[in-house]
């Protein structure tokens, strides 16, 4: 049973996973990847967010995030990114969430309290509120995407870890696969407010692709 009096790695990851899920819904709404009438207003982290009401899309997002959470529990993930891809399979935008601070530990320690000196608090809610508000302001201020695009969730692994096979098969379009070590993003980078989840710190930023080579 998860310890409710202190922070555990699993608790940090679960809270991050929920934040990632909410962020994906908001980004898909703001960037108009689906008709906006498929989304409804909801409240999360003491602010207004947007949530898809289409059951198939909701199920898919939950499946993708759950697979991401399972990989995060191994401590192998450097960062998670929602990537918006155009019809030519070129990346238009990337929304990046760093996860470097998640340690590599045995499974049996995932629910163990990290430190008795750092009790569990809900202070992270305010970080998430501020970050989501800023993220929505940034996405709403970006130029509209002029053509039909799709999206995928990418994981970049820490050095020395192979890419999980299921990420190749399920979530990465064949033409969009990349070698993370050789990828150089050409465009602008917009920082978003960091989120602290207890001992876990997540940096967030937006990368906007430009057509210049």
From Swiss-Prot:
| One Pfam family, short name | HORMA
What PROSITE patterns does the database record attribute to this sequence? HORMA (PS50815)
GO terms in the biological process aspect are: error-free translesion synthesis; error-prone translesion synthesis; mitochondrial DNA repair
One Gene Ontology cellular component term attached to this UniProt record is: mitochondrial chromosome
Subcellular location(s) per record: Mitochondrion; Nucleus
Query: Per its UniProt entry, which superkingdom is the organism in?
Result: Eukaryota
Where the protein is mainly located, per its record? mitochondrion
Domain HORMA, first and last residues per copy:
10-206
Q: Does the keyword Acyltransferase apply?
A: no
Keyword set, alphabetical order: DNA damage, DNA repair, Mitochondrion, Nucleus
Member of which family?
Belongs to the MAD2 family.
| Subunit and interaction comment | Forms DNA polymerase zeta with rev3.
- Role summary: Required for DNA damage induced mutagenesis. Involved in DNA repair, mitochondrial DNA repair and translesion synthesis. Has a role in the bypass of abasic (AP) sites.
The entry's protein name is: DNA polymerase zeta processivity subunit
* Species of provenance: Schizosaccharomyces pombe (strain 972 / ATCC 24843) (Fission yeast)
């Amino acid at each position: 049973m998860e310890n409710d009096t202190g922070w555990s790695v699993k608790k940090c990851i679960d809270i991050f996973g929920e934040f990632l899920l909410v962020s994906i819904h908001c980004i898909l709404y703001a960037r108009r990847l689906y008709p906006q009438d498929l989304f409804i207003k909801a409240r999360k982290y003491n602010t207004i967010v947007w949530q898809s009401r289409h059951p198939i899309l909701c199920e898919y997002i939950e499946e993708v995030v759950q697979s991401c959470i399972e990989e995060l529990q191994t401590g192998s993930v450097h960062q998670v990114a929602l990537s918006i891809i155009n019809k030519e399979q070129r990346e238009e935008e990337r929304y990046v969430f760093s996860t470097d601070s998640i340690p590599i530990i045995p499974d049996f320690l995932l629910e163990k309290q990290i430190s008795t000196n750092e009790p569990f608090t809900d202070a992270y809610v305010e970080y998430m509120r501020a970050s989501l508000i800023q993220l929505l302001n940034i996405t709403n201020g970006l130029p509209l995407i002029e053509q039909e695009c799709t999206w995928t969730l990418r994981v970049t692994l820490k050095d020395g870890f192979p890419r999980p096979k299921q990420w190749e098969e399920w979530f990465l379009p064949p033409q969009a696969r990349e070698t993370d070590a050789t990828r150089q993003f050409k465009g602008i980078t917009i920082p978003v407010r960091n989120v602290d989840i207890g001992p876990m710190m997540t940096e967030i930023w937006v990368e906007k692709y430009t057509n210049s080579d």
